Amino acid sequence: MSEKIYEYKDENNWFIGKMTGHNLISGWGVKHTTIKKIDDLLDGIAATLDWENPKGYDVSVVRYQSPLSLITFIIDMINQETQREIKVTPHAGTILLIENAKLLAVYLPEGGVSTATFFATSEQGFGDIILIATRNEGKTKEFRNLFGQLGYRVENLNDYPELPEVAETGTTFEENARLKAETISRLTGKMVLADDSGLKVDALGGLPGVWSARFSGPDATDAKNNTKLLHELAMVFDQKKRSAQFHTTLVVAAPNKDSLVMEAEWPGYIATQPKGENGFGYDPVFIVGETGRHAAELEADQKNQLSHRGQAVRKLMEVFPAWQAKQS
């Protein structure tokens, strides 16, 4: 085993670990009962070998909210140090540990989950499939990268050509996301995730906002939208006055459940000219924070770590298992 120190940190979780211990989770950021429950789940998966040559995990918890984050952190350590391929898959409010198509362990939330939910034969199982309410392949690719890391198979509306287009008649991001998610869920009986995302430019009073995709008119394209945006800011020379934020609102809808809503923003500035070949939408003209790099210059994994959509998905996954397990 290496002496590598692993770390994971977000707004609600902070873990530090190494694989030279005896399968121990400690710290002031988590209850003892939670430690024991996760320790019992993982203890048999990571071999400690012996006291002279330990191979187990040793994790300190500084801040804790999500069992999914902690379990994923420890499994990632085990995989990297032992070349195993254990997958952490949320499913029906539980967390499954799967290796080589075999189920190793199941983490249950407090109160358990109903057998009807867990063994449902419909395709509502979030750990198996998620239907994204969009036909935009660029957006779907981002979601596929994000959810693929968590063991989900992603479909979009192109897989269901018979479904109608849902008019985005709302005046806020949440209204539009709810319209899409709840309408498609009602029509299909499936669990559906919709997002409404856009670019808010401070110098333009928050425009293009909910009209980001149609900013240049009814026949809008990414190139036309970027050209119009740069034209609107042509007389704004100070970069600090070209501040902007990418915003996303995610809504997950399912039959007989209150919808789950999550929001996130990605701050930056609007450049004076496009740059980069990756991404889509306004990525070529969006400067990421104070980095000087355009979003379209980032590789997919880099963008997913930083972007509004990546942040929103990670926030969503913190609360999703409890939401799914809760009976309406």
Swiss-Prot record:
Tell me, what is an example of a GO biological process annotation in this record? Answer: purine nucleoside triphosphate catabolic process
Q: Name its co-factor(s).
A: Mg(2+)
EC class: hydrolase
Cofactor: how bound = Binds 1 Mg(2+) ion per subunit.
* CC per GO annotation: cytosol
Q: Entry's PANTHER family?
A: INOSINE TRIPHOSPHATE PYROPHOSPHATASE, INOSINE TRIPHOSPHATE PYROPHOSPHATASE/HAM1 PROTEIN
Describe the function of this protein. Answer: Pyrophosphatase that catalyzes the hydrolysis of nucleoside triphosphates to their monophosphate derivatives, with a high preference for the non-canonical purine nucleotides XTP (xanthosine triphosphate), dITP (deoxyinosine triphosphate) and ITP. Seems to function as a house-cleaning enzyme that removes non-canonical purine nucleotides from the nucleotide pool, thus preventing their incorporation into DNA/RNA and avoiding chromosomal lesions.
Q: Which NCBIfam families match?
A: PRK02491.1 (NF002698), PRK14822.1 (NF011397), RdgB/HAM1 family non-canonical purine NTP pyrophosphatase (TIGR00042)
Q: What name does the UniProt record give this protein?
A: dITP/XTP pyrophosphatase
Q: State the species of origin.
A: Streptococcus pyogenes serotype M3 (strain ATCC BAA-595 / MGAS315)
